[in-house]
Amino acid sequence: LTVLWLDFETRSRVDLGSKGVYNYAQDMSTEVLCMSYAFDDGEVQTWVPKYTPDGMMWLNNSPFPEAVAKHTGPIYAHNAAFERLIFWYVLQINFDLEQFYCTATQARANCAPGSLEDVGRFASVSMKKDHRGAQLIRLLSIPQADGNFREDAGLMAEMIAYCEQDVRAMREISKAMRPLSAEELADYHVNERINDRGVLVDVPLAKAAMRYAHDELVEIEERVAELTDGEITSVRSPKMREWVLERVGDEAKKLMLVKDKYSIDKTVRANLLAMENPDEIPPAVAEVIQCADDLWASSVAKFSRMADLADDEDCRVRGAFVFAGGAATGRASSYGLQVHNFTRKCAKEPDAVRQAMVRGHNIVPAYGKRVTDVLRGMLRPALIPAPGKSFVVADWSAIEGRVNPWLASSPAGEAKLDVFRAKLDPYKVNA
């Protein structure tokens, strides 16, 4: 079958990073700047539409390429979901999902980086991605300060050259790697169907959580200013690390030393709070650290992302899953909402907590010691399965620890496998 290689460059008033590819593609402001394409090993060509106040016109009265519109074979693109959704929602050309082959997925399945630039270095191919692209996107794909898009023939010529180079680079890189197996490709298409269906989320709950988080932020920063006599007014301040470092004991300082630098990151904060030694961590310092932990809680950010990514019409978050996103293992990963990484903690009475939150009632101390504790327990209840259905999350236990010794096929490897066969805890055995 003839392979169609292609790449789109687009512009939109929607921020792709914050709103996600589905909301981006479906927005009425999203337009195609150019489409570069090639069939098999043929020359790369480019189609450029022209926009008027009445809508999209074809440049020089040239219609959309008929050979592309009628293509029934495989369509190769890097991060192919983007091209597929632009076809569906912007150009309204309904190619079958099964026609699409994602070269970024192919790269990850080969334990290579997913970005076109990085995988080019990995594959050591001569055809490279053009570094100018990011600048051109900022200039042409994003509205200016006055809200209008830049119209510049010279920059557009550069954009076309950049788009064509991406097609050449993608084609050469893909050919340099092992292709996806039939099973991998089928699994990729299943992943995309799941992404198209989306996950229903509780938007009113997410917005309520954001209000509680904002109110707590004000209280936290007031408390931090009080505890530090005004030296620190925000736990996000770089001064906080130095303030803590000056007031903790020698053992605590050792815990703060990470790769020859002092840190106050999540792991360090957890270790310091676990000491529970007033000689090492004075009570006021411990409270400031706890305030920082509350403020930086990932649950707050997840609720914000949930509200941003949810479709305005049906409250579904789409495009959340990345097939073979864990490049080292091939396991699934997640974009945006990071649904694969929700805390296991769940509120004991989620319905009661939700009712209290959406009504604006006090949730502390009735449902937890701190607001962040309550919010953390409401992340999973914010995902809503269809009636009569359940969300199931499963993962292989210690997959790398099992596969690597099996691949080694050595006495030492067999000894490690025997630990798993005996159902022992490898961490305890190694300790």
Show where each model-derived region lies.
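Active-site-proximal helix-loop-helix substrate-binding element of RNase H-like nuclease domains
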Residues: T30-L33, Y37, D41-S62, A69-R178, ...
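Short active-site loop/helix that positions an aromatic residue
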Residues: A81-I93, N110, E242-V248, S397-A412
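Conserved "right-hand" nucleotidyltransferase catalytic core of DNA-directed polymerases
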Residues: L1-V14, C34, Q135-L375, I384-S390, ...
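Short, surface-exposed loop/turn microsegments at beta-strand edges and helix-strand junctions
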Residues: D27, N94-E98, V371-L375, A382-P385, ...
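Cytochrome P450 core scaffold surrounding the K-helix E-X-X-R motif
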Residues: R13-G17, T46-V48, R402-P405
